[in-house]
Amino acid sequence: MNTLPNYEIYCVKYGERPGRRPEHFVGGDPHDESMPMDYFVWLVRNAERTVLVDTGYTAKMAIRGRVLLRTPAEGLALIGTRASEIRDVIITHLHNDHVGTFYDFPNARFHLQDKEMEYVTGRHMLHNIFRRPYEIDEVTAMIRKVYENRVVFYNGEGEVAPGISVHHIGGHTMGLQSVRVHTARGWVVLASDASHYYEHFEKNRCFPLVYHLGDMLEGFAALRRLADSEQHIVPGHDPLVLQRYPAASAELRGIVARLDLPPVALFIEAVVCQPVPAR
């Protein structure tokens, strides 16, 4: 019997921006409270293989109210991985905060959904509401990668490597994909923008930048099917991720978290909330 390999998963924060609750939900939110957004890339690795999920935004894009704390390549260096070593990059979608520094990975192939390439080169880009989060230079650069035989396309779901698979979700964009990774604690799903925050999939609420609202809602159910539990679903932009999961090291607390390890905060909450036995 073939045993699937286990991987470590590192969530690397490279940027952030302030925000308010009403801007993160369709229909707004009655509580006008602070709700900042973090920006991550994710490194999946074991002794045999290293795969990067997304490449973040560029310094040019940071001027749009965002803060660039470090480039994704600099973030990876903090955990001992050089950008030049990476051979496979999964692009969950082509928004500018997920594909921006692709050029820092000169030896990589890029794994992308057919529908995302169809979306960014087709009629929907005639509408500013869909076009706005994309950068034409990044889209055309990915087309060039196709002509260089450096793009691997998927139609729905597919295996990138044993224990690592991509799954078309849609909703946020036509071709959004999430990533399923086998770890020592089970199947972890990197939702990316299928769920920006925990609150989106936990309460079936939608982020307002959306291609298809129905697909986004159905996507929450897909995430649950793919993951071993809701505690195995990792949202794409929630600052709580770095609080709920153990840091890669004491020095990297608040910068890099280990998603292949059990969520510390949830464990603590569960212990604290246990009923006190009667005496």
Can you say where each PLM-predicted feature lies in the sequence?
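Cap/insert and terminal regions of metallo-dependent hydrolase folds
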Residues: 74, 178, 184-279
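Active-site metal-binding loops of divalent metal-dependent hydrolases
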Residues: 14-15, 55-58, 94, 115-116, ...
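Core dinuclear metal-dependent hydrolase active-site scaffold
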Residues: 11, 41-45, 51, 155-184
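Active-site metal-binding motif and surrounding structural segment of the metallo-beta-lactamase
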Residues: 66-112
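Zn-dependent metallo-beta-lactamase
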Residues: 1-51, 57-59, 222, 247, ...
